Amino acid sequence: MQVLVRDNNVDQALKALKKKMQREGIFREMKLRGYYEKPSEKRAREKAEAVRRARKLARKKMQREGLLPMKPKPMPGMR
């Protein structure tokens, strides 16, 4: 992976590199490969992730169809 450093601006180059790595999923993969994961645990994790994705997709679909209220967007500067 390459990032150009312009005008000796290393901070900006590091920020761009981190963004690229985040998009590629490298940090997540490093976290997962940090220790051995048994095949049964891997299957269980992948199944749980698939269920989570399906549930999220169904929720978004219901919101688009108007069956669920849209989540209100937080106002800037307020908690």
UniProtKB/Swiss-Prot annotation:
One of its GO terms (molecular function) is structural constituent of ribosome. It comes from Beijerinckia indica subsp. indica (strain ATCC 9039 / DSM 1715 / NCIMB 8712). Residues 58-79 are annotated as: Disordered. One of its GO terms (cellular component) is ribosome. It comes from the Bacteria. Belongs to the bacterial ribosomal protein bS21 family. Keywords: Ribonucleoprotein, Ribosomal protein. This is Small ribosomal subunit protein bS21. Coiled coil: none annotated. The keyword Manganese does not apply.
